[in-house]
Amino acid sequence: MKPKIFIDGEHGTTGLQIRALLAERGDLEIISIPTERRKETAARAEFLNAADIAILCLPDDAAKESVSLITNDTTKVIDASTAHRVAEGWAYGFAEMDKEQAKAIATAKRVANPGCWPQGPIATLRPLVTSGLLPADFPITVNGISGYSGGGRPMIEDYVAKGEDASEFLPYGLTLQHKHVPELRAYAKLSHDPIMQPAVGNFAQGMITVVPLQLGGLDSVPTGAELHAAIADHFAAIKGGVVEVAPYAHLERMPEIDPEIYNGTNRMKVYVFANDKRAQALLLAVYDNLGKGASGAAVQNMDLMLGL
């Protein structure tokens, strides 16, 4: 018997991407609600409970409702919304976050797919906090830019309609209430809420996250090489991971980084830039906001949960 996969919300941006990634998978059976029954709660409940894994690509409240409709103890859930990312009983679906995280996902019945914005900063900050190079109360700011697909269908339609007239750089989240802050704080092991100041660019997908560090106030100031080594050692210990750390020796010669280099993949690349004389560093991560940042991570988590 092939595992049955139900994508609740398969017609949204993330749902469509997941459906496309699974289209050629002969080892799975994708089940879908007939078009005429899509708005029926009873139909959703029927398909949720018929699935081996239900992938929820819904707004937070709708995702919570879907979970409440599941009465089949064998149905596993991957939730792509923010509803359960720091909830008790849910495994966080960033498999490379820790060397035991893939196992935690594989054995979980409930997995919260990460948001696109926190994954890069978690990848760069968590190894530094756990190694003691950065204190948990270090003041953190996250900057970056992503493709407009991160804003969902309304933003996609707006950017496509405007074409070359669309904004090249559009900051948002200016109220300092970004919905991804709680998971970033929790999984980067920070003791205070970081500032998250994202922006959207006039390109469809791909993203760069940037964490600038002013290190001069620390009692023991780490060098760039020490920061890089801690991050590189962290990911070297994770077997089968999809996060690559750029060699430190190459970084002096890199004038720029393209946010679209990993589009269409589930990979991430991490960079550490530093000026030791100024006690400053930049932690960068590049990945596809629709890949490792959303649908690619969901499929990776699904495979772990199925033992594939």
From Swiss-Prot:
Keyword Calcium: no
Active-site residues, as the UniProt record annotates them: 116
EC supergroup of this enzyme: oxidoreductase
Iron recorded as keyword: no
GO terms under biological process: L-arginine biosynthetic process
The organism's place on the tree of life at top rank: Bacteria
Family of this protein: Belongs to the NAGSA dehydrogenase family. Type 2 subfamily.
Single GO MF descriptor: NAD binding
Keywords assigned by UniProt, alphabetized: Amino-acid biosynthesis, Arginine biosynthesis, Cytoplasm, NADP, Oxidoreductase
Reaction it catalyzes: N-acetyl-L-glutamate 5-semialdehyde + phosphate + NADP(+) = N-acetyl-L-glutamyl 5-phosphate + NADPH + H(+)
Name of one Pfam family that matches: Semialdhyde_dhC_1
Name of the molecule in the record: N-acetyl-gamma-glutamyl-phosphate reductase
Described purpose of this protein according to its UniProt entry: Catalyzes the NADPH-dependent reduction of N-acetyl-5-glutamyl phosphate to yield N-acetyl-L-glutamate 5-semialdehyde.
EC number: 1.2.1.38
Pathway given in the UniProt record: Amino-acid biosynthesis; L-arginine biosynthesis; N(2)-acetyl-L-ornithine from L-glutamate: step 3/4
Gene Ontology, cellular component aspect: cytoplasm
Localisation: Cytoplasm
PANTHER family, sorted: N-ACETYL-GAMMA-GLUTAMYL-PHOSPHATE REDUCTASE, CHLOROPLASTIC-RELATED (PTHR32338:SF10), N-ACETYL-GAMMA-GLUTAMYL-PHOSPHATE REDUCTASE, CHLOROPLASTIC-RELATED-RELATED (PTHR32338)
